[in-house]
From Swiss-Prot:
One of its GO terms (molecular function) is transmembrane transporter activity. The keyword Transferase does not apply. Pfam families: MFS_1. This is Major facilitator superfamily domain-containing protein 9. It is a multi-pass membrane protein. It is found in: Membrane. GO terms for cellular component: membrane. It comes from Mus musculus.
């Protein structure tokens, strides 16, 4: 596969590379596949480190003397920071390049977990959440990079495999974190290990075979040359079998200061985000909150409804997480069955999610809880992959970082709303949060039904906003 074109002059040799190395056509497919596998490892380590710490955060902040209300406010601060930072970080990654932005985000996230390992009071704990809340967009940037590397038809499969690799880390992390927390000062040890994992990830990103060629983006994508000008380069690369494009059309313009470029990118994206993409982001918000409500009181609800011990519930959560990881491998075959129509896959997975939330909310049998949780692990995994692919198809690959960043902002809004809605719903019944989630999923389904996108399933007639 050709990820771009060769360099066009000695003046471009000095600039730090922003794309993976590619060689001749016969060897480029192997080289590209290796690069993807390294990115999958980055995703695995990312969630492995995070999932060691996150389940222990509430327990630790309570042990520092915080009241439940203060602990809730501190916990919601992460979502607030993610909300206001994700769009800017996504835009910034489009401007400065994936490598630089990914390295900065990983290193500053490592700093946050290092501070967390030294937090002996609530103030230090809150301070430690700031760099993580602002810069923990490493998975989003990695997904944007993956979308740059592959064609639209291959993108759902590659994103599904990336989510699968990350999911394996999310399965193993809580087990390691739970074991370490039993030791003396176990939380601090876990936080320091998480910091070390992020530093290892930064080393992997630094050592990846990057070079200064364009990615698999349209011909209005921009790359920097050695004289700090930009030139649009058209690539016809695919993941396997495509020859390297030997010619490219070029024009030059002066690069503004980074913050000016970010503001210009935000201005250029404004009409697209709030016209062609409003329904896509609304669907993401509704389905995201629906699933968060399901998980928000899962342990407490099973204990109150079925007298299931938290340890047993933990096994069920690990079981469903493992199934969610396996579901990533099903994305490719399912999309082929649907002729790569991501929209219809998303619609049908959302319908299944809604029905399963209703079953979970109303059942009186623990066996039905296991059944609904099993299928939910598949439907939610497939839905997440398809909504990301739909965003990129409508928004365009030339602003993939910005589009994914806005999507993360929408998810951050969900992280703020879900705990509030869950608290109110739990005042009514332990079944309140998942019941409310089913209602929100139904609204999302109605929006999807009434606002079918005017483009084909393979994205060949992508919406554009001039």
């Amino acid at each position: 596969m050709a990820l771009g074109v060769p360099g066009h002059g000695a003046s471009r040799q000095d600039l730090a590379s922003e794309t993976p190395v590619t060689a001749t056509a016969p060897s480029s497919a192997v080289s590209s596949r290796r690069f993807l596998l390294w990115l999958y490892l980055v995703g695995f380590l990312d969630l492995f480190g995070v999932s060691m710490v996150v389940p222990l955060l509430n327990l630790h902040v309570r042990s520092l003397g915080a009241s439940p209300v203060v602990a809730g406010i501190v916990g919601s601060s992460y979502g607030v920071l993610q909300l206001f930072s994700s769009t800017f970080v996504g835009c910034w990654s489009d401007v400065v390049g994936r490598r630089s932005s990914l390295l900065v985000c990983i290193l500053l996230s490592a700093l946050g977990y290092l501070l967390l390992g030294m937090s002996t009071n609530v103030f230090l704990f809150t301070l430690a959440r700031v760099p993580v809340g602002v810069f923990k967009h490493t998975l989003s940037i990695s997904r944007a990079l993956l979308s740059d590397l592959v064609t639209e038809k291959e993108r759902p499969l590659v994103l599904g495999q990336f989510n699968t690799a990350s999911g394996v880390g999310f399965i193993l992390g809580p087990v390691v974190g739970g074991y370490l927390t039993e030791l003396d000062g176990g939380f601090y040890v876990t936080a320091f290990i998480c910091c070390s994992v992020f530093l290892l990830n930064a080393g992997l990103v630094w050592l990846l075979p990057w070079r200064e060629t364009s990615l698999n983006i349209p011909d209005n994508g921009w790359s920097l040359d050695g004289k700090h000008t930009t030139e649009p380069i058209k690539s016809e690369g695919t993941l396997q079998g495509a020859a390297t494009t030997s010619t490219a059309r070029r024009s030059e313009r002066t690069v503004q200061a980074p913050w000016v470029e970010v503001m210009l990118a935000l201005k250029d994206m404004k009409n697209l985000i709030f016209s062609a993409l409003w329904d896509v982001f609304l669907m993401r918000l509704l389905m995201g909150v629906a699933v968060m409500l399901y998980y928000s009181n899962f342990v407490l609800a099973l204990e109150e409804r079925f007298e299931v011990r938290p340890k047993t519930t933990g096994y069920l959560i690990s079981y469903t997480s493992a199934l969610g990881t396996l579901a990533g491998f099903a994305v490719g075959p399912i999309l082929r069955l649907y002729k790569h129509n991501s929209y219809m896959v998303l619609l049908h997975s959302s319908v299944l999610t809604c029905l399963l939330l209703v079953v979970y909310s109303t059942t009186c049998s623990m066996a039905m809880v296991v059944f609904s949780s099993t299928l939910l692990s598949f439907s939610t995994t497939i839905g997440r992959t398809c909504i990301t692919d739909l965003q990129l198809s409508v928004g365009g690959a030339q602003a993939s970082g910005t589009v994914i960043g806005v999507g993360q902002s929408v998810t951050a809004v969900g992280r703020i709303l879900a705990p509030l809605l869950s608290g109110v719903a739990q005042e009514i019944s332990p079944c309140g949060p998942p019941s409310l989630g089913a209602a929100l999923a139904l609204v999302a389904i109605l929006i999807m039904t009434l606002n079918r996108p005017p483009f084909s399933g393979d994205g060949s007639e992508r919406l554009k906003q001039e």
